[in-house]
């Protein structure tokens, strides 16, 4: 007769899962699949209706993408700052690599898209759609491999995706925003200056930063710029080290480490899964073979799958070979190729730009299919390459 499973064993197993590096990626993949199934089931109408219910000034979907995801960007920003000051990005040769790779990873996808749509001037308005990398999904996939992927590569991907998102924000502001609120933008700059001043004054309490951070989010949102940028900007002002000689002076007890520790589990198991479920639900109704072979669909898919891979990898190869940058520590070229492919997971920001670029629902369907196809293939290719070269190394 089999023995009953003890509650202690269940708690221990659950704790091991939550503490494993791959767990966040597994949860994200599961909820993304659940969203796709839901969006193509009898529950689809309720799913899409719920996302567009207005709660105050914003729909539920916008609260998730603009407010909740600011916490994700805050956490990623904290990690980037820590690595830049005291980690894998602490030298200029390592900082320049993700920056240049992000630029290459935006230029080549745009060129691929233009190549497919050069005969249709109206479609060229969507040139920026495949330039974006979805940082949450890309990091979710790479986290599936846990410690088998060097930490330096994960930091490289996070830094590249952050710069990529900042580039997407600039593109939206310059090419897809007609009513930028300069007054709100100026006020946001003033709040950011105050946060920087607090850092320079060595104010170590977290609550003043978080309070002004909330104000910064409101002002960035009001300016017309994607509000998640506020999370990154706030992170850059959080102190990494305490005042020398104080009890809090160790790295582990610095404000940045403390906030990073607070955010890690909620972001991995609440924020990102909610984001994934809200954004991954793409309906296949009305999709035909003709939809998949339209130049617009193919341009978006090729831009994400091929443009990102070629743009990121060729830029990294060039910089390393001419001696301007170093390959991330303990990483192989095979692993770098896999990470370059993961950069083609576009999803949220690509969808956002696509909806801004085109108002026609039929055209939007083509855009969504291109994003889904390109992102899915990029994720599969990147994961396959990482799995292959992780075994070899």
Swiss-Prot record:
Its main location: membrane. The keyword Phosphoprotein does not apply. It is a multi-pass membrane protein. It holds the Pfam family Na_H_antiport_1. InterPro entries: Na/H_antiporter_dom_sf, NhaA. GO terms for molecular function: sodium:proton antiporter activity. It catalyses: Na(+)(in) + 2 H(+)(out) = Na(+)(out) + 2 H(+)(in). The chain crosses the membrane at residues 24-44, 58-78, 96-116, 126-146, 155-175, 178-198, 214-234, 267-287, 300-320, 338-358, 369-389. It is found in: Cell inner membrane. NCBIfam families: NhaA, PRK09560.1, PRK09561.1. HAMAP family: NhaA (MF_01844). This is Na(+)/H(+) antiporter NhaA. It comes from Rhizobium etli (strain ATCC 51251 / DSM 11541 / JCM 21823 / NBRC 15573 / CFN 42). The gene is nhaA.
